[in-house]
């Protein structure tokens, strides 16, 4: 399989979690492209410098059951949301809720899901990318769908440390009307009578808000 588009190197590999019968794969492959003897090798290279580019893994939000990702269809990850916005995505770029196909009136981004936490399954450090792509997604949403959709980002700290990142943040607030709330939401629940999501969080002065 090709694990993801634009993989480097651009080569197919065997997904051992799905198929471990190598002999059967060799038998049915029409191009005779599977070579069982072509296994992992260790080589020693003499180089002048080393660049560390370990990549990253996606976090599974189901670890945090209070957000009910995987239970409530309208709770999605940023990657899921990018697919919704994409012209080649499941809704062909239309902003539609997975649960009922209707257009949402409010969208909330919850930052630091999986990072900067002490619970089991989380990491203690900042992912360093989420603030900027959340701002980008919120701005794209406001730009494409205008005043029809309210965009709110719930954050711990807006880490806009790169070149012109702070300017980008100011544009999101002042030009696009993106709302920023400094709070880490506690739970996401669904109102049974309406099917709408209800997000519970503490305001900056310690009050509970919905």
Regions found by a protein language model. Name each.
Residues 164-175:
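Short, aromatic/basic amphipathic alpha-helical patches
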Residues 46-55, 210:
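Short hydrophobic core segments
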Residues 1-28, 36-44, 54-162:
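Rossmann-like dinucleotide/flavin-binding elements
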């Amino acid at each position: 399989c090709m694990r993801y588009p634009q993989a480097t190197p651009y080569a197919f590999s065997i997904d051992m979690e799905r198929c471990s019968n190598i002999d059967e794969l060799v038998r049915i492959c029409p191009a005779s492209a599977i070579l069982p003897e072509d296994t992992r090798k260790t080589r020693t290279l003499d180089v002048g410098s080393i660049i560390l580019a370990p990549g990253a893994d996606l976090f599974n939000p189901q670890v945090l059951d209070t957000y009910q990702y995987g239970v409530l269809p309208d709770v999605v990850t940023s990657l899921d949301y990018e697919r919704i916005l994409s012209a080649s995505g499941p809704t062909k770029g239309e902003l539609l809720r997975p649960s009922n196909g209707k257009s949402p009136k409010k969208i909330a981004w919850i930052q630091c899901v999986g990072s900067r936490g002490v619970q089991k399954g989380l990491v203690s450090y900042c992912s360093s990318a989420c603030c900027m792509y959340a701002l980008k997604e919120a701005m794209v949403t406001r730009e494409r769908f205008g005043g029809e959709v309210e965009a709110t980002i719930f954050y711990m700290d807006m880490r806009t440390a790169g070149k012109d990142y702070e300017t980008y943040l100011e544009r999101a607030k002042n030009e696009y009307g993106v709302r920023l709330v400094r709070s880490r939401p506690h739970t996401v629940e669904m109102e049974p009578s309406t099917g709408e999501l209800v997000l519970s969080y503490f305001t900056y002065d310690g009050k509970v808000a919905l």
